[in-house]
């Protein structure tokens, strides 16, 4: 799906995370993250990719997800919970939040405030958002932007 395309959106912005989108993130979290929470887990793709990449490609103790939830879980082990009901106690043993959030800006912007108030947060979404007026209110919360390049999010 392109940003300027007219494809019909998938309900609840459910687009599983492709491996290609996760690989560039790994060097930035190695040595800093041992556990993470995934509050928009969907089918668990992002979790599997992070655990696979850190367990198989790097000679380290792999990074593991110790809490996963979604408004509509699509895999076992993912709790049913709306991200906006996520509490600090739910993820107190997680080092960070890492998620591929919904594309809808009204949800994304609320999610940025909510997640960053709980834990350091890594979000996978379009990098050019940083250069829009709507990002102005959120820029002070950002520490780093990692570009993942062009990625095919919808197979076919």
Protein language model annotation of sequence segments:
Residues 1-156:
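Class I S-adenosyl-L-methionine-dependent methyltransferase catalytic core
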């Amino acid at each position: 799906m392109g940003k300027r395309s007219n494809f019909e959106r998938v309900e609840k912005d459910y687009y599983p995370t492709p491996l290609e989108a996760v690989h560039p993130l790994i060097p930035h979290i190695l040595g800093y993250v041992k556990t993470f929470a995934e509050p928009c887990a969907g089918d668990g793709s992002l979790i599997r990719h992070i655990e696979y990449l850190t367990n198989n490609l790097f000679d380290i103790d792999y990074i593991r997800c110790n809490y996963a939830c979604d408004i509509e879980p699509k895999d076992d082990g993912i709790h049913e919970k709306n991200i906006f009901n996520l509490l600090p106690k739910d993820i107190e043993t997680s080092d960070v939040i890492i998620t591929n959030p919904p594309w809808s800006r009204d949800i994304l912007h609320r999610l940025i405030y909510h997640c960053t108030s709980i834990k350091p947060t890594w979000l996978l979404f379009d990098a050019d958002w940083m250069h829009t007026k709507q990002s102005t209110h959120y820029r002070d919360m950002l520490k780093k932007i990692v570009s993942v390049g062009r990625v095919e999010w919808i197979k076919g």
